[in-house]
UniProtKB/Swiss-Prot annotation:
Protein family (similarity comment): Belongs to the adenoviridae hexon-linking protein IIIa family.
Function: Structural component of the virion that acts as a cement protein on the capsid exterior and which mediates the interactions between the hexons, including the peripentonal hexons, and reaches all the way to the penton vertices. Two hexon linking proteins IIIa, one from each facet, stabilize the unique edge interface between a pair of facets. As the virus enters the host cell, hexon linking proteins IIIa are shed concomitant with virion acidification in the endosome.
Induction annotation: Expressed in the late phase of the viral replicative cycle.
Residues the record lists as Phosphotyrosine modifications: Y490
Propeptide: 571-585
Name of the protein: Pre-hexon-linking protein IIIa
InterPro entries for the chain: Hex_IIIa, Hex_IIIa_N
Organism: Human adenovirus C serotype 5 (HAdV-5)
Location of the region described as Binding to hexon-linking protein in the Swiss-Prot/TrEMBL record: 138-251
Pfam families membership: Hex_IIIa (PF02455)
Entry superkingdom: Viruses
Biased composition range(s): Polar residues: 14-24
Subunit architecture: Interacts with hexon proteins; this interaction tethers the peripentonal hexons to hexons situated in the facet. Interacts with the penton protein (via N-terminus). Interacts with packaging protein 3; this interaction is required to promote correct genome packaging.
Cell location: Virion; Host nucleus
Length: 585
């Protein structure tokens, strides 16, 4: 026993034993030791902090794992002290220094080992990637050599040709178990993923050289299809999954073939449950023929019948909202006189938030449809708003809004040959109008004599004015009164006749153009208007005599009693009421 005590390892083990619990202690002693943390009051354990109680309970029930590092360091220090390498008072300092050094260098070694491990893993992954890409790198070099032999530009379909070459590069890069190599003057692409398949790239591009951008008719594509070789078809089939509808135009023949191949490859995976069900049904019916089974599968997978479109209708709540929108929009249009778009916005603002929140999709779709209808065809929008029984068309429910186009009112849009062959009733009306025009022309020929009877001294250019009697009264002398028209002249006066339509819509469809030409012909420049204004007439002999005698005021332009019925607009209109100085003497 004394020999064991002199052993540094045994002594270190004895020195490192904890002063608390041992594995050989009884549970009663363990509980007594835990409860007797306070020697004076055993019941004070429950008054200890929760962390202290929890730590003591855990350590008593499940002891901590022993770490032999400090025991080994302590054994080394005891051996050094026995061999007198260190003094006993230096044992504690050496023990602490050794523990710190072990902790420091052990952690450093762990980090170094981890760094080395990470570096080794990265190097292994890099080597694996390089080993896998050795074949693809060689294939890319061979592919670039092949593409260097091909022309960079083609006569037509340049965009399709460029996208096809890009898809070929992508296929060579991404497809595993494939390679591009040269054998003689030709280049080949070989893949062994799903069976060994080899494509002669040189012959395939030579065959496709004249087909880039070719647009074959939809009905007959057999003429173009006969130009493709099986080698070219295989290349199109292999490259189809690496293209999309935007890379190669679907209008071209090659784009159409790529689309068909892509859809066929995408639908090649048949649901096994469907296959098993059809197989079991065929066997139950006694049809063991493989051909009939394939025919059934082809019918079920390819001949899919279209479903009849469902009939849409409004429920009671949606119809109530529709009627409310119709009434509100019509009220805003008639009361405020706003535009249809503003009326719809006012209706949306005045809508109850609860009703809008519960029917938001329908209200948004309805407002969108009405806005489009108001912009495309205002007449259709007005009829839809004012019709209390109006219901949206089927396109309203599916999202494809169909609003009939509005009629712009151009008469030439509705012209046909029947317009220029008038009906008998139209001919009768034309004859009556021709007679009326002849009577008006006779009246215009007779009008200058009536002007002379009225005593008008108007210029010759004023005879064509539409108001000859008015001009005559304005330009006549102030000493004579105008003569009243007779009964026949009064009835035949052109001013009292109803306005004659210049162009009839049934017989003259370009009525708008004729009216525009008529308006433009009546336009005059400023110089023409200034030239046509009649100047002041020289005073007559009697007027000069009266002014010399001082019987007429200088600023009096219409002082005669005979000018009461004068329609002139110049001078003092009440000058005839002013007393005359000449009559007072």
């Amino acid at each position: 026993m004394m020999q064991d005590a002199t052993d540094p390892a045994v002594r270190a083990a004895l020195q490192s034993q904890p002063s608390g619990l041992n594995s050989t202690d009884d549970w009663r002693q363990v509980m007594d030791r835990i409860m007797s943390l306070t020697a004076r009051n055993p019941d004070a354990f429950r008054q200890q902090p929760q962390a202290n109680r929890l730590s003591a309970i855990l350590e008593a029930v499940v002891p901590a794992r022993a770490n032999p590092t400090h025991e080994k360091v302590l054994a080394i220090v005891n051996a050094l002290a026995e061999n007198r390498a260190i003094r006993p008072d230096e044992a504690g300092l050496v023990y602490d220094a050794l523990l710190q050094r072990v902790a420091r260098y052990n952690s450093g070694n762990v980090q170094t080992n981890l760094d080395r491990l990470v570096g080794d893993v990265r190097e292994a992954v890099a080597q694996r990637e390089r080993a896998q890409q050795q074949g693809n790198l060689g294939s890319m070099v061979a592919l670039n050599a092949f593409l260097s032999t091909q022309p960079a530009n083609v006569p037509r379909g340049q965009e399709d040709y460029t996208n096809f070459v890009s898809a070929l590069r992508l296929m060579v890069t991404e497809t595993p178990q494939s390679e591009v190599y040269q054998s003689g003057p030709d280049y080949f692409f070989q893949t062994s993923r799903q069976g060994l398949q080899t494509v002669n790239l040189s012959q395939a591009f030579k065959n496709l050289q004249g087909l880039w951008g070719v647009r074959a008719p939809t009905g007959d594509r057999a003429t173009v299809s006969s130009l493709l070789t099986p080698n070219s078809r295989l290349l199109l089939l292999l490259i189809a999954p690496f293209t999309d509808s935007g890379s190669v135009s679907r209008d071209t023949y090659l784009g159409h073939l790529l689309t068909l191949y892509r859809e066929a490859i995408g639908q090649a995976h048949v649901d096994e449950h469907t296959f098993q069900e059809i197989t079991s049904v065929s066997r139950a019916l006694g049809q063991e023929d493989t051909g009939s089974l394939e025919a059934t599968l082809n019918y079920l997978l390819t001949n899919r019948r279209q479903k009849i479109p469902s009939l849409h209708s409004l429920n009671s709540e949606e119809e109530r909202i529709l009627r409310y929108v119709q009434q509100s929009v019509s009220l805003n249009l008639m009361r405020d006189g706003v535009t249809p778009s503003v009326a719809l916005d006012m209706t949306a603002r005045n809508m109850e938030p609860g009703m809008y929140a519960s029917n938001r999709p329908f209200i948004n779709r309805l407002m969108d449809y009405l806005h489009r209808a108001a912009a495309v065809n205002p007449e259709y929008f007005t009829n839809a708003i004012l019709n209390p029984h109006w219901l949206p068309p089927p396109g309203f429910y599916t999202g494809g809004f169909e609003v009939p186009e509005g009629n712009d009112g151009f008469l030439w849009d509705d012209i046909d040959d029947s317009v220029f062959s008038p009906q008998p009733q139209t001919l009768l009306e034309l004859q009556q109008r021709e007679q009326a025009e002849a009577a008006l022309r006779k009246e215009s020929f007779r009008r200058p004599s009536s002007l002379s009877d009225l005593g008008a001294a108007a210029p010759r250019s004023d005879a064509s004015s539409p108001f000859p009697s008015l001009i005559g009264s304005l330009t006549s002398t102030r000493t004579t009164r105008p003569r009243l028209l007779g009964e026949e002249e009064y009835l035949n006066n052109s001013l009292l006749q109803p306005q004659r339509e210049k162009n009839l819509p049934p017989a003259f469809p370009n009525n708008g153009i004729e009216s525009l030409v008529d308006k433009m012909s009546r336009w005059k420049t400023y110089a023409q208007e200034h030239r046509d204004v009649p100047g002041p007439r020289p005073p007559t002999r009697r007027q000069r005599h009266d002014r010399q005698r001082g019987l007429v005021w200088e600023d009096d332009d219409s002082a005669d009693d005979s000018s009461v019925l004068d329609l002139g607009g110049s001078g003092n209109p009440f000058a005839h009421l002013r007393p005359r100085l000449g009559r007072m003497f």
